């Protein structure tokens, strides 16, 4: 009875007259508005069911469907951009798209090999597209014949094979399910080329297809890690809650991500490829992809390097999140070999440093110029991206005493110079993706979050730690090409008589630094005057039009252009506490967005 009451929302039906009228507008917005694509964020605790996610800091995401058979090409033409959206991008009629299933026969699919690759890469759970926006189920479904078992010559259920392979190899397994968009169905959101907008009944879609299929996924594949929802769009709070309750009633330990919509879910999924600049509270993840698209595309060989993937993984973990990296198998069921080779190289590094990744805590420090830090109990792991040429790795802000220091397992010496810990490392960088210095402390971590500027590094002043007057930190999201999301945290909204951002930090020794400003400027603020004050240094300079592209809704509302301008030299004649203030010199320049200030040593 309790279970029936929880899911009864969908049995009884809810009046959705307003939803039908909104469907066309919402479908268009889902092409490029991040709020509609991903829903509201916010810290989530996950309660007891989310405890395992901290111990699974690295995961595999898989986009696989009928779009994989097309590989980004339709009717002799390549549709550039994320290829899993090809049905909508090419406006393929649902009847024509159904025929793709007639030739979809992924005989190279081997569940054990996929899971072994994830395991070799150091990943601990897998999420896969059970149904993406195209509406095709990659599992056997009684709710719709448009599924891989009934509609293709393959006739197998790869989700059952993957679920079993994950159990055999000790990985958790979960499903992606597109709850709002389904381009195969009149009653769902997204297909406005086959179906007249405003004629569908979204509640009927939920009742007849989405809920029955989600119930199948929760009932037929054993214990699952969770259901990964996406693009909530116009789904109502009651509908979102109904789906959450459905998942938790059938599998109480399964997680629901925040893209269920309306502020619900057990953990937060950030924007595609979004890595926060500073630590973030709660349970969260960053979904990223190994190349540019998510599903297989015949032309996309823009693979991220092993070092880039490892650094992105470390950045996410050091901020307190889980990094979920996507692969896109092709229409035959094979993960591209070049991608697999890159993942295995990443895995060799992860397996050598598992204690610094899985189950690790975020950094206790402020921004570190040379890299990132993760922690576990009384141990710190320093991930060094910029290797010190003088053999001295400098760490400021650590008050705890160091018992032992090791670099890739070998002992290294440390010394104190005032408030600074100096770690003596070889002049030659170790041959590994990211060298890791392990500091075993004599007691609990006692550290300051004060930022530092180091002479041997390219230093960034993070927007989130500045003291602000008459401006604010705003997230800027856009797509360079369709589906290729970019994210920046910018100083923006310059208003009032006093407008400035001030950073406090420490320098370890005297030095001179170039100041680079990365910004975007619309035409109306061209040649606006700006200034920097830092000790005895005062700089005045113009910021000029960066040539932003006019607004296009299909590209996230705008296509901003950022440029970097070297505005002058800042001198620090003495080490110690410093303050740098940046802001407009006049009353104009209200629309300029500043994404980074960098201090680069003068050499």
Predicted regions and their residues:
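N-terminal secretory signal peptides that target proteins for export/translocation
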Residues: 1-4
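Sec/Tat signal peptide C-region and signal peptidase I cleavage site
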Residues: 19-23
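Bacterial N-terminal signal peptides
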Residues: 8-18
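Mature catalytic domains of secreted/periplasmic carbohydrate-active enzymes
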Residues: 24-512, 522-559, 565, 569-571, ...
